[in-house]
């Protein structure tokens, strides 16, 4: 009998759970590759002439029947009226596309507060089943969007899918953390992020024009996530409920033991029960803290502000601008096959997510965050230089492409996973739920801002757009250097002392045993 025994039930349960994480990634990446074909359909539905030569040249329309009939004179003379209509039409399409992308984050932002509540109210398994209803509704709206007002149906569908992902982004890590053996909790916990980046990559591959990313099949590409929702719902009936939920929340010791026996593969689960008993006693001895108290209580103010800044830094780094709009960025950079370059980004993202699993356990959280932000800053400079000088030197397109690949790599080394680790490690059991909720909300809010505004910023700044992100990255790198303490291998008392040095405020101490539960008590 070993603590790190991997059973078939455990593997099956983790894979089933991260199917939700997979959709999270799928919904992030799926909107990228078919951008031009969906925009052309928006124009068709709204009766807006597709007279943008660049748009026509950069996307192959299957037939002239797909476009609204437009008559042109042999010698057209543009009038102020016509120019105003063209500008207004272009602005309308840009707005609708930005909403199509960003509405996903609106849903996530709204639901991020309720994942923990839903899990505690219904249980982890039932909560994921209920969340799948949202996933299926969103998939149906997008899958049938070609039959109606596509822009409205896609925006509504992505909003509802965002609600699902907002719930699942809290439910899946919580469930995996509660079913995993202590020795495997860190490794299995990374499957959530790995499934997300795998979903991004798969959506980019099947979004290729010759697969589903074409005028005939793009709506199937968007609605395909409904299949995953049905599959996961069926598989969840064979998964055990979280033993921690059964024991700590419901006081069902017999059912908790049954669940543990299935997951561990042996009958003597006394050690797990004793650990949960201690955790329940720790939780009951500490008063819950509200979101308002995080900001009004001097003990928590500095940690929550630093936690929020880490999440703001993650999103305002420009990474989701890459994920949402990489095809158009590569197109601007002069890459002849931008969609394939986008798939390359997804592959690099997945590889370095796997690498980060080992780095996070070996190196300090703060160190990795600093390395990641510094590397992204340098890459953003090279991206912008490549775009600015592209007209003079054609080979600069490769500079921009390599810089984007490295940008994503540095993100996954530090700024991608680290904020979630550190927020959990900043706070003990009492304030942690509120801290994680407000951190998730701020993350989704910044995600929405980037998704909505990136296209406008890119249009306004042109090739200089990543100079703007470089400035933001530099500012957050300096903030991290001066304000963020190291948490790896430290107890709450030691982390509190670090914050006290930086702000002069005291943070409530807590026993180091809980840091062991979080996987943060390794020696440096």
UniProtKB/Swiss-Prot annotation:
Presence of keyword Transport: yes
Positions with a binding annotation for D-glucose: 193, 314-315, 320, 349, 412, 420
Positions annotated as glycosylated: 62
Localization terms from the record: Cell membrane
UniProt xrefs under Pfam families: Sugar_tr
PTM-bearing positions, type Phosphothreonine: 523
Activity regulation annotation text: D-glucose and maltose competitively inhibit fructose transport. D-glucose, D-fructose and maltose inhibit deoxyglucose transport. Glucose and fructose transport are inhibited by flavonoids such as epigallocatechin gallate, apigenin and quercetin.
UniProt PTM comment: N-glycosylated; required for stability and retention at the cell surface of pancreatic beta cells.
Function: Facilitative hexose transporter that mediates the transport of glucose, fructose and galactose. Likely mediates the bidirectional transfer of glucose across the plasma membrane of hepatocytes and is responsible for uptake of glucose by the beta cells; may comprise part of the glucose-sensing mechanism of the beta cell. May also participate with the Na(+)/glucose cotransporter in the transcellular transport of glucose in the small intestine and kidney. Also able to mediate the transport of dehydroascorbate.
Protein name (database record): Solute carrier family 2, facilitated glucose transporter member 2
Organism: Homo sapiens (Human)
Gene from which this protein is expressed: SLC2A2
